[in-house]
Each structure stands twice: as C-alpha cells, then as structure tokens.
C-alpha cells in the first residue's frame, strides 16, 4: 500500500485528526500512477538530490525517496510535521524542514545534503495560490537547479510554456523561458485530489539552459520592458511603452529611435515579440537612455 492510496490517505488524515487549511492551498494527490509518472518525467535516480515543496502527507516524497540520493522537503504547515514523521519513518534519506520556502536560506540548507555536489532537481506539487512567486524565487536564487518538474494549475503551466502570438504568452513566459526551457509533460485531472480543486492541473518540465536564452545588457531592465509591454494586452507596444516611460516629446523621440533600431513597428503588440526581439528592444531603449 502507498501513502497516496485513497484508503491510506483517508486513514492517515483521520488518525491524526488533520483538517485542510485553505490558506495553504492544500490538495493531496491520491493517484499512484500519476506519482510514478511524475518521478519518471523527472528522471530521478541515486545520483540526484531533490528539493520538494509542500510534501503534504508524503505521497510524492515516498516515490522520490525510493529513487533519489536524498530528498529535502519544505513544509510550511507545522501540523503536518508529526504526520510526515509517521508516514516517512522508513526513509533515512529524507529531511523535512518546517519552513516557508520563500523565507528560508536555501543555499545553507543545500549544504546539509550528504553530497551537496550532486545535481539538484525540484520536484513538487506547488500550492496554486503561490506558484509563480515560488518558481521565480527558485529560478532567480542563484542556486543551479538543473531541472524542475512541478505540478501547478494548468492555466499557469500554459502561460509559462506559451510561445509568441498565442493568448497565453506574456511576461511570465519570458521571465521563465529566459532561464529555462518549459514544456507541459501531461495533464492531471482535478478528480485525483483530496479535496478536489476547482481546476485541472499540469505537470510542467523545465530544464535550465546552460546560458540565458538571449544576451541582454541589463537583465532587470529587460524584464521591466517585457512586463511593461503586456500591461494592456490589447494595446500596441507604443501605447504600453509610452504608458510606462512617459508621453513627453523627448520620450516619444527616444522610443521612436529605439523601435526603429530594434526593427519593430510601433503598432505591433507585445504578444508578437520573441525573446530575441524583446532583448533587442530592451538594449535599444537602454541605449537611448530610457
């Protein structure tokens, strides 16, 4: 029997008198086939350390621990600590940390792996309400995670993996794809969770690029420009950029020159631009002193 078997999950929750907290976005997966598929997608073996976020009662942790060198799981809900101590008692390669992943000194914790030099993968069922902040926090942490295989709301996975000229494409697509390749591996129906969420989920596989997707002079400025370009999706690049930089004649003159230098029409929309085009635009705007 597995932790994720519905009867086991139910018994564990009842035994510990656990009640779900909406504020933590708790939805526990009760499908062992999907858990197996997640671990297979992540290609976990004994030469990999794993960071897990939000282990719940340990359903995914169990599958990870059977194959990984070590698993370090971060759980914000202190009420789950005794449950995890119970369900994962047979594994000596699992460490559960009762901390908020957004506030913890992750680099320090990683040094506690027996072999901290092994590749590190992030495998997790992320809380829906805080998926994007967690992902960006980890991606921008400076820690060289080689891969992420994470479950999230399908809509968010679609946005992250979206390509130009699609409805889902936006500043989040650019922010993630600058650092990583991103592809939806498979869909997870809402019916396999306790309690069932209101939407379907997706497993997103993201692999870190050896170098960022495009070269830019100023990364922060590049992200600001891309974000500004999507402020109002139905507006043109010109309207969004003047909304961000200002509408004085001097600014308009600089914008005109930068767009011309980048080879872009003022009437194009942000959703039509590739990462390379955003890079060219950001560098041109920077060159104009904006």
Curated annotation (Swiss-Prot):
Which Gene Ontology molecular function entries are recorded, alphabetically? Answer: 16S rRNA (adenine(1518)-N(6)/adenine(1519)-N(6))-dimethyltransferase activity; RNA binding
Q: Which SMART domains match?
A: rADc (SM00650)
- Enzyme Commission number(s) of this protein: 2.1.1.182
Q: Where does the UniProt entry say this protein principally localizes?
A: cytoplasm
InterPro entries referenced in this protein's UniProt entry, alphabetically: KsgA/Erm, rRNA_Ade_diMease-like_C, rRNA_Ade_Mease_Trfase_CS, rRNA_Ade_methylase_Trfase_N, rRNA_adenine_dimethylase, SAM-dependent_MTases_sf
Q: Which UniProt keywords apply?
A: Cytoplasm, Methyltransferase, RNA-binding, rRNA processing, S-adenosyl-L-methionine, Transferase
**Record-listed S-adenosyl-L-methionine binding positions:** 27, 29, 54, 75, 100, 125
Against SUPFAM superfamilies, the record matches this protein to: S-adenosyl-L-methionine-dependent methyltransferases
Q: Where in the cell is it found?
A: Cytoplasm
Give the reactions, separated by semicolons, that this protein catalyses: adenosine(1518)/adenosine(1519) in 16S rRNA + 4 S-adenosyl-L-methionine = N(6)-dimethyladenosine(1518)/N(6)-dimethyladenosine(1519) in 16S rRNA + 4 S-adenosyl-L-homocysteine + 4 H(+)
Pfam families, A to Z: RrnaAD
Q: Which GO cellular component term is one of those annotated? A: cytosol
Q: Which NCBIfam families match?
A: ksgA
PANTHER family per record: DIMETHYLADENOSINE TRANSFERASE, DIMETHYLADENOSINE TRANSFERASE-RELATED
Which HAMAP family has this protein been placed in?
16SrRNA_methyltr_A
Q: What does this protein do?
A: Specifically dimethylates two adjacent adenosines (A1518 and A1519) in the loop of a conserved hairpin near the 3'-end of 16S rRNA in the 30S particle. May play a critical role in biogenesis of 30S subunits.
Indicate the family of this protein: Belongs to the class I-like SAM-binding methyltransferase superfamily. rRNA adenine N(6)-methyltransferase family. RsmA subfamily.
Official protein name in the record: Ribosomal RNA small subunit methyltransferase A
Native organism: Streptococcus pneumoniae (strain JJA)
Classification from the root reads: Bacteria, Bacillati, Bacillota, Bacilli, Lactobacillales
